[in-house]
């Protein structure tokens, strides 16, 4: 590098132009916030209209990217545009610090001395020392700036940056640095960078405060679009997706955003179930970075949620990006949904199992597997997943509460899955045939009832179906006993107990369901205003009881219950038929 060739002839012309920061505040603020890729986009657009400023900041970015040669090229171009450019002179002096530390330091101090009445130049010199790691010199320059302009907000931003930089960006210094950034807005409540820096430093330790700072900023200056990007991220972080979307809309209107911004904007749309917009954003990001891991992740997720025909292709692309590392349980769960949508059930459940094995304590991860099994009418598998989920919930619950009890909704659902498994198997011969090939199921049935023949279970569909049905109906019966014990005054447990007993033996004359339907009737008859569901269940109970007493030739109770049916359903054909027959018998 021929840095010394330019020597510091620059020092002969330090009567300089107006501060660059005043000419392009948003681009400069991007740079000072560490958003270098966005600052670069901004200044590349400014090269033709403002080459002095644009080349200086592009040189600054190149310097921070450890590309001294490129930085020198930019600074020289800035000087070519304006040979009296103080800021590009500062850039060249900063480069000189690497090859001639004393010469570079002297050059920077000369610039500061010559421009001591220009606080922006003084601050720029302080930043040059700071980015070169010369913190003592930077602090000295900062002290001079503070003495000369103690109410200038940029002085306090530099002070906050120095606190961080000189302490290796230690998080324990966040409060101290944040205090300096807040001083910037204290002295100038309309100074955007002060709010941005404060929000940036607090976003991980106090997201509420960070959000408030940015909301204050956009209230004062609604057109300061940089703030909306950070505000969108904070809203997303706090789960306020509607607000995040509105903020990102304004931010993206600037045309200056990164692939990571696209990913975050796509994320909040995805979690708001706005899959079309999320897909549009993902596709936009993938045009520039087709192998972006997170964008490909959301591409697959969107396909899963929207049942996109290209889901399998999207999943294949996503899982090709890394060699089985960096994937999370939800990735496999979403892949399972895609396989499920493609009716590749065995593969789907294998992926659900993989997802669960990666994060077994995440009780929510079982939900899609349970739903998928029910959709396939594989209630046995649904019950298996649900039972494991209940056990995990109990394990977590007891860790915090020794008196933890299983959720009533879960008990009901598990009982119903058992009931459905037992009552529907006779209507699912393909599923029965599949189960018969599973030795673990054969062994389970034989162990539960030693009188059963394992050979018959494995070869005779009717024999297997009957044994399988009884096994799960008895499990359902036990679950509904638990439900009744927990909530005896609810009709639900009694009703399901009635259904289960009837499924075990549907001979109404035996009346296995009778006492349970009688209990249903007693409970619902006490309800002042019946819902449509209440009326339907009560009608179900009266129908069963009316038919039971009819089969028992109990005329009084037959008339009683079929009469109750007509009170609920005046046009009920069965009730009319039975009651008419009773009247005719009495003639």
What is each residue range found by the language model?
Residues 544-547, 556-559, 573-574:
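Alpha-solenoid helical-repeat scaffold
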Residues 5, 20-550, 577-586:
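Alpha-solenoid helical repeat scaffolds
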Residues 1-3:
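N-terminal secretory signal peptides that target proteins for export/translocation
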Residues 562-563:
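Amphipathic alpha-helical segments within well-ordered protein domains
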Residues 567-580:
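Alpha-helical oligomerization segments
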Residues 7-18:
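Bacterial N-terminal signal peptides
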